[in-house]
Amino acid sequence: MEFDVTIEIPKGSRNKYEVDHETGRIRLDRRLFTSTAYPTDYGFVENTLGEDGDPLDALVILDEPTFPGCLIRCRAIGMFRMTDEAGGDDKLLCVPSTDPRVEHLRDIHHVSEFDRLEIQHFFEVYKDLEPGKSVEGADWVGRTEAEAEIERSYKRFKDQGGH
């Protein structure tokens, strides 16, 4: 399964950018309150709706960071199940579908334990100093469950009147 991911935040950034879905422009939401930086490029899957009412979040493993607004054709290799103050907030873990350097990454167990722990740690602490915000990490699931969530998110989007 391949899909498009729109990047909002490049790897290494402490700025949290979001696409304004009404104007199509990129807005600086905030600088992270903690001293952590995004461990991968971060964005969303086009034409989806996650459990939190926003497009489904996606992390993209790349050697070099891209830029806000960059569109990348991806495939999922797993998903980090988590919740925040608004409810379910799952994060897909993806790789560019045309990059031969990541061809060996086909499922979550192909990602090193340390890399998974680094991503998990980021999401467990990145909101720590923000008033009224909270995060609860859960666990990693594999490609099959990630792809099932993508399908559910496409359906939620369509059921809400998306095209």
From Swiss-Prot:
Fetch the InterPro entries from UniProt.
Answer: Pyrophosphatase, Pyrophosphatase_sf
Q: Which reaction does it catalyse?
A: diphosphate + H2O = 2 phosphate + H(+)
Q: CDD domains annotated for this entry?
A: pyrophosphatase
The name under which this protein is listed is Inorganic pyrophosphatase
Quaternary assembly: Homohexamer.
Return the HAMAP family for the record. Answer: Inorganic_PPase (MF_00209)
Native organism: Streptomyces coelicolor (strain ATCC BAA-471 / A3(2) / M145)
Provide the E.C. number(s) assigned to this enzyme.
Answer: 3.6.1.1
Q: What are the GO MF terms of this UniProt record?
A: inorganic diphosphate phosphatase activity; magnesium ion binding
**Does the record bear Hydrolase in its keywords?**
yes
Q: State the family it belongs to.
A: Belongs to the PPase family.
GO cellular component, alphabetical, reads: cytosol
